[in-house]
Amino acid sequence: MEYEVPASSVEAYQETGFAVLPAVIDDRTLGMLREECAYFVGYTDAGMDAQGVEVMGITHRGKRYFISNRYRSSARLADFLFGALMAEITTSFLGESVFLFNEQWVVKGADQGMKFAWHQDSGYVKAFDPATTHPPYLTCWCALDDMTESNGTISVLPHDVLGTRNHIFDHEREQGSNDLIGYAGAESGEVITMGAGSVAVFSSTSLHRSGPNTTDQQRRVYLAQYSSSPLMSSTGELWAQAVPFITQGEVVYSKQDDLDDSAVSPRIRKTIRAKPKQHG
């Protein structure tokens, strides 16, 4: 039986700005995501080696990784991002029009995984485009490990606590970490504890943070973000990407068209791009 998002989860999202979908990613897919995560962390470490640096943006070697928009360098990730599970989740919360806006690995290293301050995902858009008026988009926070306070899970503030439903706070950059901070008050939020294979969904205007990882294992998340329409800057330019996924409730994504491009990483197996042979 295919998964269906419970009506209670949609209601919770509409009321508070977030919801948890327990154990929705099957074991085989979970294993694939963990393998891909290991590849991209290694790739990022190699990139820092080549540049002779320990920090790239908000990525800190061994402590915290944010690795964005690399799915076209994988033969397998598109099957998850544009598959039946994500189609069900995204249409339940966004409606009949869905675009992939952003995807990234978020990994906290063992023992030394850094915290991440209170912020709104939309705050990172506003930081570069103060005049932005984009509607909230959907973050799907996919747990590749059991998420606990000890390994640095997220805490989320319900919309009504600080009035974040359709409001993007100004964010300030923190020296050293390069984090953008949107709130520094006393509210503690709701701690999201959930098992591997679960997905936390929240609005891009929801304030959230994560603690440090004090365990002896990595804490791994695959984060996929979707919008109901392309996100455009205040000057009319496209933000990140807008890969068509769902139109009028139907899947329109074509992996063949998306990955059959000379710019796609050679890591993609040739069979993904192979066209039918002509006989005659």
Task: Pin down the residues of each PLM region.
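Short edge-strand/loop segments of extracellular domains
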Residues: K108, L157-T164, Q225-L231
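Double-stranded beta-helix
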Residues: E11, M147-L207
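A short secondary-structure junction signal
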Residues: M114-Q120, A127-P130, S150-H159, R165-F169, ...
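Short, structured patches in soluble enzyme cores that scaffold and shape functional sites
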Residues: Q104, Q120-S122, C142-D146, P158
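Short, conserved beta-strand element in jelly-roll/cupin
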Residues: K126-E149, T193, Q225-S228
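Short, surface-exposed loop/helix-turn segments at secondary-structure junctions
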Residues: E54, Q120-S122, H171-A186, E237-V243
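Non-heme Fe(II)-dependent double-stranded beta-helix
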Residues: M1-T16, P22-W118, G123-Y124, D129, ...
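Non-heme Fe(II)/2-oxoglutarate
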Residues: Y43, M48-V55, V199, S206-G280
